[in-house]
């Protein structure tokens, strides 16, 4: 007996399985009817309207109904969906023993102690037939599953079979008066619609139960004479076939098994007995210690039985239904119907290999339990519980599909479990001595090894290793070294599933899944409330497993979820993509197609494959609260926003991710005071003053709103709030606002209107308002309050704000987790001295005078015309900054060149050195040095997407010539070229060839960078651009020695790219004469480039002056603030502070396509901003970003690569190729 579910309750007298759902009804002697979910082990509902014991209960086959009959003489029909009794049928005059629905007609049959059987129409709620004939209690009555028959058992020692075919023939309803007459005759005389067909006599005492065979013309009955009798019937008669003896007390219930040729009976002798219906002998007996059995019920579809006893009920199976199988590569071997079969996953072809020997005993649970397969020898080990545990070894010939001529060679032995451990070796567990016997394919023992723990079962764990299962843990045991390789606490493991690479293992127990690595290092544990049945690993390293009613997944970090709900249990054999191959309980191969997008999505998040995540968001149909909750728990609320439609959920996620814009939109839709309040708190945390103001206005929170205006410097709005408080008669709010404003007159007026004349007098006196104070003193008369003496009076006015603050600058969070970027810092740092800036870093003629002088002259101090300052400075490309002294010219950097001497090396015999260079290397610079320009260009095209090689031609020639030395011999002899190797020495072996010596090195690039920095500082923009481009063109051809230098080269590319972009924009700006707004935009974009601090100060000063001249004061103030944050010199700081003071609180006169609060990059071709979250394409070499329309065109920054081309990346070191 395999117990599936058990309850503890009062005596169970009636049981009924639901035909489709995993439910069972139990009627108790206490009068309660319980409805249980036997899969989950939970009580779903209880019904307790009966008065006294309920002995019969039955589910309807198709409708949401069940019927019950009790000792209160009532039959009740219930609707379990609405949890109520629909109606009650009255008619029986004594206890009702059993009730049952008909499988087709709207009938209920009931048996009662009033010696009658009644058939009811539950739709018309009337009794349609009364079957009389028994002369004692009728203990049970049931319909035939197919024919129009009823069988009944009575304590009058008979079993009767009734013919009810006449009832079915009544297809037309009679008239009402005839119906009433028929009903009267039925009650008095029993009617003629049901007649006795057979009376079966043979029991010596009262018969307690009788039931039909599902398909054969057989009846089985059980009685108080402790016997079970089998009866056969035909069209004319019925007779006794055999008697089964063995029970020691009254037989309570007996039935035929629906799927097996057995009879199940239970008795008051506290036992359940299983009988062979063919041989008519006892097979097995299950006993309880204290509980008598009363009722049996069988599931109409599944192999489940239930038995009710004195203290509850038990749901059980007689035999295991899990097929024995083993997966090997693309094939699964399994046993079905006593045949060994295999199934190919790719072709879905099933082949029957050979029959399996039948067990000699007739007991239950003799089917194969486990199967192990050796692919090299085509050998199969099948283990079962026959004779206390045994195995059979079959060597399957390659061409033996279905033949049995080899069965004489099947080898058998005793053992708890057996498994292959090598190509031609298998291990057998000998439980009695706790050792493993290693046998060969001739079934001969070749080795014995004691086990380190008390082992219940063994499993394969790699060649030469076993996974030994004890009661509370598992260990991996090496049979050769006799060592424990790993141990893990995992109680009651039933199945072990290894991944295809043997790197991970899943240990399945009854209610848990434990994931570990190959050394049994624990990774995660999942606990399930219902039974775990099987599992398999998919190609992504996710474990897919099944429970009784679900297919579920387990990620490497322990996160799990449901993939699909199952109607019946399955056993997974293989997972390929969205296809799950499995075996059902009948041994049939099935293919279940599932949607794996949820766990693939979570796996991509876990492995930080954000590109894959974004692709799935755009293309997949991911939805559901589970995905949203998962993203929220894992810290990705901004991603969860993509899936949410409900506004309240969107609002919560938006607040959590800091996305104020979406939160505002959702709050407008919800329009609830609490949501506006929460929005205000989050907006205040982010410094978004506008949204805080809006939220306070929507909630009419005037006190907070007034204080917000105070701390942000909007004093005019504080005055407006004071007026609103007056209109609302809010004296306290009005007084607070007057305090914020420092308006003493207003405060005196408010206090006087409020009747607080002494306070008004004190306020007026303190602030020197003598006229008002005198008037108030006259009104107060003798009640004038005294003021403290000896204390100097002071004017109590709050400090006036210098400028009104706006929103705090914030990074936008949209898709932020999917965009990575590193801030590059310069390798060659520049001195922090910007006094040498050339005059072309102009402030656009900005002439700022002292503020006090400006006020004295009655102007604003900003009247100088553009181009008026330093016009005499006509230096080409100068910065035009006034009062700036240039430092002395820095020394021209020395050209590093190749420091090593080019020593003549005589060419050795054999392959030319230049050919050896190209065969050994995948570096473009070395191929160019060898003269193999074609392969060098192909390498650069594949690695960096370069298509324009014109700028590289002179560099190729320099590399080739620089890596060779040319020996002039006699005048008539040709010049002899000699390859120059890097690091050559006289002691070097003549057979070892080093790489070519290259004329371009990384230190050279650093020197060129310093020269380009100086040209930039001097304002020689065309010269600086030429030098930066020279560096950018040379980098693909240099070779460095270490990974660290590779990173420095990549860092150098980013630095040069930023300067090239900025200088191109500056030169473009100088070409524009008429478009003033575009000039300001280009100057603003230049400030977004990552520059050295000395250059950033110059760029900010230039942009600040240009915006100020065009009256874009807010933007100019922003640049002034940034300039002050970049440690300017004294003159720059003074100029910036003056601009900040003059622009404070003012707005821009024109709108620019520039938002400094929103992170962006500048398109290298169109010079427009690409804000965070917008689509772009990039250059595969320099990494410059472009709008999508530029894709396929030549990069305007490096002038080499094609924008958007596929490339593998820069390769400039041999260490990248190892």
From Swiss-Prot:
Transmembrane segments: none annotated. It comes from the Eukaryota. One of its GO terms (cellular component) is Golgi membrane. One of its GO terms (biological process) is intracellular protein transport. Keywords: Cytoplasm, Cytoplasmic vesicle, ER-Golgi transport, Golgi apparatus, Membrane, Protein transport, Repeat, Transport, WD repeat. It is a peripheral membrane protein. Residues 862-876 have a biased composition (Acidic residues). WD repeats lie at residues 7-48, 49-88, 91-132, 133-172, 202-241, 246-285, 288-326, 363-404. This is Coatomer subunit alpha-2. The lineage of its organism: Eukaryota, Viridiplantae, Streptophyta, Embryophyta, Tracheophyta.
């Amino acid at each position: 007996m395999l117990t599936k579910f058990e309850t503890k309750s009062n005596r169970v007298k009636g049981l009924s399985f639901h035909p489709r759902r995993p439910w069972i009804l139990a009627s108790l002697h206490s009068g309660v009817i319980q409805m249980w979910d036997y899969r989950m082990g939970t009580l779903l509902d209880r019904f307790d309207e009966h008065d006294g014991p309920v002995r019969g209960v039955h589910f309807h086959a198709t409708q949401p109904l069940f019927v019950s009959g009790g000792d209160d003489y009532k039959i009740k029909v219930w609707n379990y969906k609405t949890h109520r009794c629909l109606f009650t049928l009255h008619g029986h005059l004594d206890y009702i023993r059993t009730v049952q629905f008909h499988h087709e007609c709207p009938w209920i049959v009931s048996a009662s102690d009033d010696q009658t059987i009644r058939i009811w129409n539950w739709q018309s709620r009337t009794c349609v037939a009364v079957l009389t004939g028994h002369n004692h209690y009728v203990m049970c009555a049931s319909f035939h599953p197919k024919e129009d028959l009823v069988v009944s058992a009575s304590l009058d020692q008979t079993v009767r079979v009734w013919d009810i075919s006449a009832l079915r023939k009544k297809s037309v309803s009679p008239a009402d008066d005839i119906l009433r007459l028929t009903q009267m005759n039925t009650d008095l005389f029993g009617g003629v619609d049901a007649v006795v067909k057979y009376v079966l006599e043979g029991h010596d005492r009262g018969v307690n139960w009788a039931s039909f065979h599902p398909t054969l013309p057989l009846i089985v009955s059980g009685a108080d004479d402790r016997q079970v009798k089998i009866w056969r019937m035909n069209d004319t008669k019925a007779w006794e076939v055999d008697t089964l003896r063995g029970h020691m007390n009254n037989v309570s219930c007996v039935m035929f098994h629906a799927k097996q040729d057995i009879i199940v009976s239970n008795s008051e002798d506290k036992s359940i007995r299983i009988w062979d219906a063919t041989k008519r002998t006892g097979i097995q007996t299950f006993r309880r210690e204290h509980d008598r059995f009363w009722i049996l019920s069988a599931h109409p579809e599944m192999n489940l039985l239930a038995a009710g006893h004195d203290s509850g009920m038990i749901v059980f199976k007689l035999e295991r239904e899990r097929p024995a199988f083993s997966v090997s590569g693309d094939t699964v071997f399994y046993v079905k119907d006593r045949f060994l079969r295999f199934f190919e996953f790719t072709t879905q072809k099933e082949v029957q290999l050979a029959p399996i020997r039948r067990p000699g005993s007739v007991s239950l649970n003799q089917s194969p339990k486990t199967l192990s397969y050796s692919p090299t020898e085509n050998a199969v080990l099948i283990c079962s519980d026959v004779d206390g545990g045994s195995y059979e070894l079959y060597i399957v010939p390659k061409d033996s599909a279905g033949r049995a001529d080899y069965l004489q060679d099947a080898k058998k032995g005793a053992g708890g479990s057996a498994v292959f451990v090598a190509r031609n070796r298998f291990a057998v567990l000998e439980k009695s001595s706790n050792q493993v016997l290693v046998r060969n394919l001739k079934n001969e023992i070749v080795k014995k090894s004691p086990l380190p723990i008390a082992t219940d079962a063994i499993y394969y764990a790699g060649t030469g290793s076993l996974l030994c299962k004890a009661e509370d843990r598992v260990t991996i045991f090496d049979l050769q070294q006799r060592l424990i390789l790993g141990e893990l606490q995992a109680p009651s493991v039933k199945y072990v599933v290894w991944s295809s690479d043997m790197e991970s293992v899943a240990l399945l127990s009854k209610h848990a899944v434990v994931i570990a690595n190959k050394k049994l290092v624990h990774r995660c544990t999942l606990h399930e409330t219902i039974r775990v049945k099987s599992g398999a690993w998919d190609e992504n390293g996710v474990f897919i497993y099944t429970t009784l009613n679900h297919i579920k997944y387990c990620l490497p970090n322990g996160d799990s979820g449901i993939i699909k709900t199952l109607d019946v249990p399955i056993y997974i054999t293989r997972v390929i993509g969205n296809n799950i191959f499995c075996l059902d309980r009948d041994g049939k191969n099935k293919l279940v197609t599932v949607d794996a997008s949820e766990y693939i999505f979570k796996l991509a998040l876990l492995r930080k494959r954000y590109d894959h995540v974004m692709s799935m968001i755009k293309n997949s149909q991911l939805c559901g609260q589970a995905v949203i909750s998962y993203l929220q728990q894992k810290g990705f609320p901004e991603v969860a926003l993509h899936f949410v439609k409900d506004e309240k959920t969107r609002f919560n996620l938006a607040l959590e991710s800091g996305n104020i814009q979406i939160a505002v939109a959702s709050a407008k839709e919800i329009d609830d005071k609490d949501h506006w309040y929460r929005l205000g708190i989050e907006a205040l945390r982010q410094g978004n003053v506008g949204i805080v103001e809006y939220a306070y206005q929507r909630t009419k929170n005037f006190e907070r709103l007034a204080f917000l205006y105070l701390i942000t410097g909007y004093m005019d709005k504080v005055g407006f709030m004071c007026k609103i408080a007056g209109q609302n008669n809010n004296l306290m709010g009005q007084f607070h606002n007057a305090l914020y404003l420092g308006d003493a007159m207003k405060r005196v007026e408010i206090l006087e209107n409020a009747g607080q004349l002494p306070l008004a007098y004190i306020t007026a006196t303190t602030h020197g308002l003598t006229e008002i104070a005198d008037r108030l003193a006259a009104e107060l008369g003798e009640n004038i309050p005294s003021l403290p003496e000896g204390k100097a009076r002071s004017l109590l006015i709050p400090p006036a704000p210098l400028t009104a603050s706006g929103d705090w600058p914030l990074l936008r969070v949209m898709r932020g987790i999917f965009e990575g970027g590193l801030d590059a810092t310069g390798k060659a740092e520049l001195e922090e001295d910007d006094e040498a800036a050339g005059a072309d870093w102009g402030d656009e003629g900005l002439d700022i005078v002292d503020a006090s002088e400006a006020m004295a002259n009655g102007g604003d101090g900003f009247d100088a015309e553009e181009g008026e300052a330093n016009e005499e400075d006509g230096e080409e490309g100068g910065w035009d900054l006034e009062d700036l002294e240039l430092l002395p010219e820095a020394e021209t950097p020395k050209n590093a060149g190749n420091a090593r001497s080019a020593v003549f090396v005589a060419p050795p015999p054999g392959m030319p050195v230049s050919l050896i260079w190209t065969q050994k290397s995948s570096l473009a610079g070395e191929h160019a040095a060898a003269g193999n320009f074609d392969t060098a260009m192909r390498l650069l095209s594949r690695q960096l997407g370069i298509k324009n090689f014109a700028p590289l031609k002179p560099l190729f020639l320099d590399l080739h010539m620089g890596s060779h030395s040319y020996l002039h011999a006699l005048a008539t002899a040709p010049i002899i070229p000699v390859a120059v190797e890097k690091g050559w020495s006289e002691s070097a072996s003549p057979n070892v060839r080093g790489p070519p010596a290259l004329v371009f090195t990384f230190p050279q690039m650093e020197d060129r960078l310093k020269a380009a920095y100086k040209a930039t500082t001097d304002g020689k923009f065309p010269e600086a651009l030429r030098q930066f481009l020279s560096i950018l063109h040379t980098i693909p051809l240099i070779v460095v020695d270490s990974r660290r230098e590779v990173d420095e080269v990549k860092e150098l590319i980013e630095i040069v790219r930023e300067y090239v972009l900025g200088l191109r924009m500056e030169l473009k700006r100088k070409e524009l004469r008429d478009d003033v707004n575009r000039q300001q935009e280009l100057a603003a974009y230049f400030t977004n480039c990552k520059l050295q601090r000395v250059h950033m100060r110059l760029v900010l000063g230039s942009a600040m002056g240009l915006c100020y001249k065009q009256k874009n004061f807010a933007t100019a103030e922003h640049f002034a603030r940034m300039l002050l944050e970049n440690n300017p010199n004294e003159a720059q700081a003074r100029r910036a502070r003056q601009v900040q003071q003059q622009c404070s609180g003012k707005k821009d006169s024109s709108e620019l396509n520039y938002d400094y609060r929103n992170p962006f990059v500048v398109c290298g071709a169109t010079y427009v901003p690409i804000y965070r979250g917008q689509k772009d394409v990039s250059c595969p070499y320099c990494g410059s970003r472009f709008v999508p329309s530029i894709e396929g065109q030549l990069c305007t920054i490096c002038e080499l690569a094609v924008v958007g081309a596929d490339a593998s990346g820069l390769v400039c070191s041999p260490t990248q190729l190892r």
